[in-house]
Amino acid sequence: MSFGRWAASIGLEIHLQLATVKKLFSPAKVNPLAQPNTCVAYFDVSLPGSMPILNPEALKFAVKGALALNCEVANVCKFDRKHYFYPDLPAGYQITQKEIPIGRNGFIPLSAGLDNVPDTQIPIQHIQLEQDTAKSTSAKNPSRILLDYNRAGTPLLEIVTKPCFHDVNTVSAFLFKLQSIVRFAGISEALMENGGMRCDVNVSIAPVISSENLNELHFKNNGVISVEKSISHFPQLGTQLARVELKNLSNVRNVVNSIRHEVDRQVSLANMGVSWPSETRGFDDITGKTFPLRNKTTSDDYLFLPETDIPPIILSRSYVNSVLKSLPALPDELFQKLTTGSHAISHKEARTLLSVKEYYHYYRNAYHHIDSISHVNQSLKEDALRTLPYWITVELVGKVREIDPSPNINIVPPLQLADIVLLVSKKKLTAASAKLFLRSLIKSPSSKPISTLIQEKNFGTIGDSEKIKACVESVLSKHSKQFEELKNGKTSLIKWFVGLTMRELRGQASPKDIEMEVQSSLRREK
């Protein structure tokens, strides 16, 4: 079989639950953890006579989201009805924005430094404010389903990209970046595991018609450009074949794996000369395959009509500017700040600190605490500030993750960690001893001053040279064979003896001081 040259084009539709206190058009509270059907107002279940009242907090969050994603904000907030019949939609229509979305023509920047993919901008076609549906689950009786209306009416922000993706690395980087932006903006938790962020994927393939740079592209055996590698200069493509929408993808891993399978499925059919329908498909994360759900619907099928119960709301320039002023610094700005100037931390450390909003705020609080101490000389401060990112991103996050996969690093308050780092810089605590002490503090948190805890748990640095000397001599005598090898010139054993002595002293002595004692013992024996 002779294969053509194919490339995939991928577009995303993301639904974000906004972190409002109340629902979009009713006074019911938003609480994903509440017992089923306990956060429901009359309008949420479309009881006759109930009317929608727009939640101003949801509108503000939507405008904030549009600004955070570099969109042009609409001059008016106007809603439409999207009609379709499904049990989780009691009114028979969803209130959304078809004619005038809240934001258009935005973009999310991706960079090699922060996002670990080639520098690019992902165009946002539009974002719209709409209501979520009820949550349906299967009942024991297969002819029935269970409906929880707690979710019905929760404000959603739908974000639609152009079909500009050609590889899964950029797709996953985009999704993680979007999560980071909306979390720092304070408008959504964007947790995919509980439905707070849901992703649909549009996948199509097209023939490669340009002959430039083909040698630089990685074609798989079936003739398609691999979706595994990011490509800076993508070739010109012909007419797209039938587009398939992949629905209900619950995490980034499923998004990536569903794209891989669907691209290969479409290419296999195309190579055999078989066409396929434009349809909606699901993804089975056990088999790793997509499966048909229903035929693809068009806009006409939904019979969009204006929502006459909610009058248009003018979004004045002063209102939009006031929302813009409330927007905090976002990841790209913070990455630039962290990796330059007085901070100048590594890209890897900055990426970790910005991967979770709480990590960044933890770092900022610890940094300001160290920087504000007046009785510490400047060189010690600079040393502590230089090593602080390591202690947070590697030692603290790493050790807390051993206990909890979704770590709460505030189990050790930032001021306590700052004091530990300062003591290491002052050489009142060795790095090895500090790591052991930090582990004990994570397991048994305490509000006592760090200096008191170190004394109580006997973690302070051993400055007594006689004690270090005695411990070194004890270690050397226990391992006389290796000491003989050392005396005969096997100098690599010096580090080995230092490690053994460090273990005996619980890391409380400086490796440099221990090595000096080992060298002294070696000279005496010679």
Swiss-Prot record:
Query: Where is this protein primarily located?
Result: mitochondrion
Organism of this sequence? Schizosaccharomyces pombe (strain 972 / ATCC 24843)
A GO term for molecular function: glutaminyl-tRNA synthase (glutamine-hydrolyzing) activity
The record's similarity note reads: Belongs to the GatB/GatE family. GatB subfamily.
Source species, domain of life: Eukaryota
Designated name of the protein: Glutamyl-tRNA(Gln) amidotransferase subunit B, mitochondrial
Q: Where does it localize?
A: Mitochondrion
What processes does the entry annotate via GO biological process terms? glutaminyl-tRNAGln biosynthesis via transamidation; mitochondrial translation
Reactions listed under catalytic activity: L-glutamyl-tRNA(Gln) + L-glutamine + ATP + H2O = L-glutaminyl-tRNA(Gln) + L-glutamate + ADP + phosphate + H(+)
Keywords (A to Z) from UniProt: ATP-binding, Ligase, Mitochondrion, Nucleotide-binding, Protein biosynthesis
Q: What are the EC numbers?
A: 6.3.5.-
Q: What InterPro entries does the record tag this protein with?
A: Asn/Gln-tRNA_amidoTrfase_suB/E, Asn/Gln-tRNA_Trfase_suB/E_cat, Asn/Gln_amidotransferase, Asn/Gln_tRNA_amidoTrase-B-like, GatB, GatB_Yqey_C_2, Gln-tRNA_amidoTrfase_suB_CS, Gln_synth/guanido_kin_cat_dom
What exactly does this protein do? Allows the formation of correctly charged Gln-tRNA(Gln) through the transamidation of misacylated Glu-tRNA(Gln) in the mitochondria. The reaction takes place in the presence of glutamine and ATP through an activated gamma-phospho-Glu-tRNA(Gln).
